[in-house]
């Protein structure tokens, strides 16, 4: 194999693989170029969903995660999956932030409090993460462990919380550690819109023991449903009492608090309420600003009573870069993405897309880095201003292709990456004739660009980051299917025969995933993959 130049990565966003049928926008389309390359060039199918891209098992892929994995050259586990996988491996129970919290609560002889959303909504928290913490407390002999349960009803059914609470009570009974000390809906505890009076109600229950009372959390929820049939999200603060009617331990001086939500946005305010020393000043300034803008203020402005002193606070993930608290699962930084390896080798690169997918070929592909690397040029075409893209399924693909063709013909770039957004963005409309046009547009654009790459002695890798356009009919309802899919995606290598990258000379390994693309591209460029890249090249010599 000789080194091709340039190497093009063309991402056909949302172009998945599925059997032909009336709902398959890809197979319904007239795509002579892609069909020809599929029939004559090295091809394989890639996994682009679930654990293969760092998402929970069975979860559909998406463009952000897809491009992140493509550029990182490794499976980038999302926070929720990192935590879940660490429970399976046992690393969870050796987490330094958790063990430090255990040590502190033992040394002080105080109480452990676990706060967060319960249930299996999976958007902000997972029940297995709370169960893992309870198991850890049992292992470490932290018997004085209290749970402040935020109820969902938004990412779960409105009155599903009763069942989830029964499951939690069963888990507590099996593990032998933990008591639910308070129950409150996420409407209050997880406000993110500076409605401090809502957060104040959660604070009052957890810290002051103020709210409705119930002898157990099941009764608390049943009583709440009678007060407000809207369900879990709107459960007013309820304090759980012991057999003598005394509230279970509140969050008090010297206690340890672990917030087990993995998603940050809806637990920043409750974290500030518990921990920020100048909270009241901040709240007053915010409301003053609201008043200056002529906005309506609440009847009473919540102000925190005296702050609980000497709390030790642990966040499950990084909730805010300015928070000085212990983090159990800090951000995973991608230090050597594909673009950096190429830049460090002194090579030139070109990243291109239209507006809808421009962040994906820049920020996400480059490992969540905003600034371009040395020798990296970025070119964007504006997406059309239409209400929905079925009205203009061609989008701005022709402009993207024209700019890309100019870049190829300039012969100054070693590596080029382009995203054609059409199959995904039009796929989200569920309008099959428009999706067909979208796929045909991408095929036509590739038919202009790929031959130019090959003519220069180069190679093009055609892939998708996830599926979408190949499933436009919901198999359950028969109605439109507008979401991404878990289907495999294509990977086609089209190259100048002189490079030795033909179907007769090489094959593309089966069973690959998006994380294998960066090592494959570096293999084509004759560069060593970064040490952190755990993906492997798809190219196999016959």
Swiss-Prot record:
One of its GO terms (biological process) is glycolytic process. CDD domains: iPGM. Pathway: Carbohydrate degradation; glycolysis; pyruvate from D-glyceraldehyde 3-phosphate: step 3/5. Coiled coil: none annotated. Binds 2 manganese ions per subunit. InterPro entries: Alkaline_phosphatase_core_sf, BPG-indep_PGM_N, Metalloenzyme, PGAM_B_sf, Pgm_bpd_ind. One of its GO terms (molecular function) is phosphoglycerate mutase activity. The active site is at residue 63. GO terms for cellular component: cytosol. Mn(2+) 1 binds at residues 424, 428, 484. Substrate binds at residues 124, 154-155, 186, 192, 263-266, 357. Its EC number is 5.4.2.12. Pfam families: iPGM_N, Metalloenzyme. Mn(2+) 2 binds at residues 13, 63, 465-466. It catalyses: (2R)-2-phosphoglycerate = (2R)-3-phosphoglycerate. Keywords: Glycolysis, Isomerase, Manganese, Metal-binding. The keyword Coiled coil does not apply. Its cofactor is Mn(2+). Monomer. Belongs to the BPG-independent phosphoglycerate mutase family. Catalyzes the interconversion of 2-phosphoglycerate and 3-phosphoglycerate. This is 2,3-bisphosphoglycerate-independent phosphoglycerate mutase. It comes from Herpetosiphon aurantiacus (strain ATCC 23779 / DSM 785 / 114-95). The lineage of its organism: Bacteria, Bacillati, Chloroflexota, Chloroflexia, Herpetosiphonales.
